[in-house]
Amino acid sequence: AEAYLVDKVPRFDVVGKQPLRADEKYYVVDQGLRTALGFDNRADIELVLENIVCQELRSRGCTVHVGWRGSREVDFIAQRGAATRYIQVSYLLADKATAEREFGVLESIPDNHPKTVVSMDPVSRGRNGIEHVNIVDFLLEDPLAEWNG
């Protein structure tokens, strides 16, 4: 029997639309397991939030990849049917540099698929057509509302 304790998420070249062969990322299936192993979730809040978003996307039936645009990482490329959505995850967009990092990589992707930044900020500050949502709102949204694939 196989125990699925972690999910392997392959990397994907956003520009070339090709899978990359190395450096997959791994996400735990149960956040409680990570805590039980002694990891400090408060110190690793960015990783915890990424993990939550990854598992939520999988539970919604999405195929999930980690994207690369040049030397910059796109946290998730989520696909379901013909629909694609790019997602960046950040703890807080507390300063200009963080906002630029999270929105900037999405702004550099030259297609019209929906792009979203998910954070714990209580107020949404989308820009240039990129949606910004609080993680609670992301988790509560209708999983089929914006997927037309």
Please place each PLM-identified region on the residue numbering.
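Accessory nucleic acid-recognition modules appended to NTPase machines
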Residues: 1-84
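Hydrophobic/aromatic beta-strand patches that form the interior of the parallel beta-sheet core
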Residues: 27, 87, 116-118, 131-133
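Short, hydrophobic beta-strand segments that form beta-sheet elements in well-ordered domains
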Residues: 66, 112-119
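Active-site ExK catalytic segment of metal-dependent nucleases
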Residues: 79-94, 102
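Domain-level recognition of nuclease-like catalytic cores that cleave nucleotide substrates
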Residues: 121-149
